């Protein structure tokens, strides 16, 4: 009877953990997949913006992690960075996906210039008129950018909110814990014509980590102890949080640029609805800050 009783308790505990762990992320895959696995909640807003009057050539030299933070560890010292070092590639992809910009290769400009130099040197070395003519046709003038996008990841705050809950009754129980981090991105548009900073935008994304655990602890008979533990942890990838923050910054930069005349939409009347939604979102965010008591801390009145 005792075995049946404990079996029922174990089954109930397993059922609770399975039902709670359902929405958690499952990391198991059989093979690599094509394309992106993670589509951010901002990506649809970015790609569904009304089209521009014409695409704007822009340059991105470096969009760096400026936090200098290493991965948090409670046991050993880690020399792995907490933030992805590929933010430049993420920004270029976001600019490309928006449909508003023509990103130009500037991060590895030396490689591009070296390859063009090789083509010219080969045509001169062999003194072949046909080869020279072909080289001149291939090597079109490089496109210059009117705007440079600068900025970087300027903040990564860990453990800004932590908490949990647990309960145990006669050796049977479980617990849930969570931790909230935050990543902050700044993006600015710089005029190539005169070096003026045209606009600066900021985007913030929280990173959620959660742990669910359960256990069973009972003496089933004399000197016979039954102990079972199980659990699962879900950590939102920091890279995906950075991607979402960058996409949000690009989305906001497009709208702010339209407002001050940096670039123009194809249909200004259609774009007015986008600006209205954007302004409403900013007002709601400000209200949330004030209601949370953070407005004075950030200097918002």
What are these regions (language model features)?
Residues 1-10:
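Bacterial N-terminal signal peptides that target proteins for export
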Residues 2, 41-45, 133-135:
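Short alpha-helical segments and helix-capping/turn motifs at coil-helix boundaries
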Residues 21-54, 157, 165, 176-301:
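C-terminal/domain-edge helix-coil "capping" segments
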Residues 57, 61-159, 184-186, 190-200, ...:
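N-terminal segment of the mature soluble domain
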Residues 154-171:
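Charged, amphipathic alpha-helical segments
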């Amino acid at each position: 009877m005792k075995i049946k009783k404990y079996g029922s308790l174990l089954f109930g505990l397993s059922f609770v953990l399975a039902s709670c762990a359902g929405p958690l992320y499952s990391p198991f895959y059989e093979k690599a997949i094509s394309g992106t696995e993670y589509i951010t909640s901002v990506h649809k807003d970015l790609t569904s913006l009304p089209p521009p009057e014409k695409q704007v050539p822009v340059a991105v030299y470096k969009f760096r992690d400026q936090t200098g933070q290493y991965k948090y560890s409670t046991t050993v010292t880690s020399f792995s960075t907490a933030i992805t070092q590929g933010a430049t590639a993420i920004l270029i992809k976001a600019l490309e996906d928006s449909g508003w910009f023509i990103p130009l290769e500037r991060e590895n400009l030396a490689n591009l210039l070296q390859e063009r130099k090789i083509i010219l040197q080969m045509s001169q070395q062999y003194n072949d008129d046909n080869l020279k003519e072909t080289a001149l046709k291939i090597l079109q003038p490089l496109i210059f950018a009117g705007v440079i996008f600068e900025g970087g990841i300027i903040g990564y705050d860990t453990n800004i909110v932590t908490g949990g809950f647990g309960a145990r009754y006669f050796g049977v129980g479980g617990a849930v814990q969570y931790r909230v981090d935050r990543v902050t991105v700044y993006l600015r548009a710089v005029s190539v014509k005169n070096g003026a900073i045209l606009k600066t935008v900021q985007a913030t994304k929280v990173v959620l980590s959660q742990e669910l655990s359960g256990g069973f602890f009972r003496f089933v008979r004399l000197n016979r102890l039954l102990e079972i533990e199980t659990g699962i942890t879900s950590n939102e990838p920091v890279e995906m949080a950075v991607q979402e923050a960058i996409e949000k910054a690009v989305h906001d930069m497009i709208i702010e640029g339209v407002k001050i005349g940096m670039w123009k939409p194809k249909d200004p009347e259609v774009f007015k609805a986008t600006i209205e939604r954007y302004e409403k979102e900013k007002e709601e965010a400000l209200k949330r800050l004030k209601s949370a008591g953070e407005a004075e801390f950030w200097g918002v009145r």
